[in-house]
Amino acid sequence: MRIAVPNKGRLHEPSEELLERAGLHLVDGADRQLHADTVDPDVTVLYARAADIPEYVADGAADVGITGLDQVRESDTDDLVELRDLDFGRCRLVLAAPEESDIETVYDFEDGRIATEFPKITRRYFDRVDVDVDVTEVSGATELTPHVDIADGIVDITSTGTTLRMNRLAVVDEVLESSVRLFAREDTADNEKVKQVDTALGSVLAADDKRYLMMNAPEDALDDVKDVLPGMGGPTVMDIAGSDQLAVHAVVEERAVFETISSLKDVGASDILVTEIERLVE
């Protein structure tokens, strides 16, 4: 099985890190410019340009791919199925115009010129809003085009908006909200190995916002402890040899840990230990 991941850029390291955390450790010594073996002899990682990964999967060069939704949509490939939002690389594809222009809405671009690295998404967007524009594909420095009279506006990726502000561009509309996705072809989405990879990556994401709590509690306080814990399916309770205390374990949301610990102490729990969870298969 072959997994296509970005070979460089802001998505490269997070993609590799996610695979490592999921247990698909990359084997040292492989030609990491093109591909890498993993500890699973049936799984190989292929490195490709983020924009090319949808085609790799669609053409059968890879079984699954990891890249941004913006790249999948721009590829305009019909037989790709999204398996999972991998929850990183979040950004927006926006329509923007110079701050000093009179453009306030998308309709002000009628018969105008738009520069973008995403011509297919851009044309579909303007078709949807029924505005006639001339779309020019560029391969970089999109933000400069309105200032050198190449375009009246741009459609480009932004994460924080800083680059747009630096180039005196204002957002007119949001075209697409994007993040990194795991996807496959329709005919391989139900493949057992594909499902295993999907489950492994999902287990990392599920664990990210959870914490594992362990504590001791008097038996007569158990009901109160259970009431406090917002755990998954109730806590695990075990006897402690030679003690009248019980060991209570539970998985809780990370954002609830602070208040939960305080409440647990109030009802008699002690020796509370909080640990991170590497993976959680729900």
From Swiss-Prot:
It is an enzyme of class 2 (transferase). GO terms for cellular component: cytoplasm. GO terms for molecular function: ATP binding; ATP phosphoribosyltransferase activity; magnesium ion binding. It is found in: Cytoplasm. Keywords: Amino-acid biosynthesis, ATP-binding, Cytoplasm, Glycosyltransferase, Histidine biosynthesis, Magnesium, Metal-binding, Nucleotide-binding, Transferase. InterPro entries: ATP-PRT_HisG_long, ATP_PRibTrfase_cat, ATP_PRibTrfase_CS, ATP_PRibTrfase_HisG, HisG_C, N-reg_PII-like_a/b, N-reg_PII/ATP_PRibTrfase_C. It catalyses: 1-(5-phospho-beta-D-ribosyl)-ATP + diphosphate = 5-phospho-alpha-D-ribose 1-diphosphate + ATP. Feedback inhibited by histidine. PANTHER family: ATP PHOSPHORIBOSYLTRANSFERASE (PTHR21403:SF10), ATP PHOSPHORIBOSYLTRANSFERASE ATP-PRTASE (PTHR21403). Catalyzes the condensation of ATP and 5-phosphoribose 1-diphosphate to form N'-(5'-phosphoribosyl)-ATP (PR-ATP). Has a crucial role in the pathway because the rate of histidine biosynthesis seems to be controlled primarily by regulation of HisG enzymatic activity. This is ATP phosphoribosyltransferase. It comes from Haloarcula marismortui (strain ATCC 43049 / DSM 3752 / JCM 8966 / VKM B-1809).
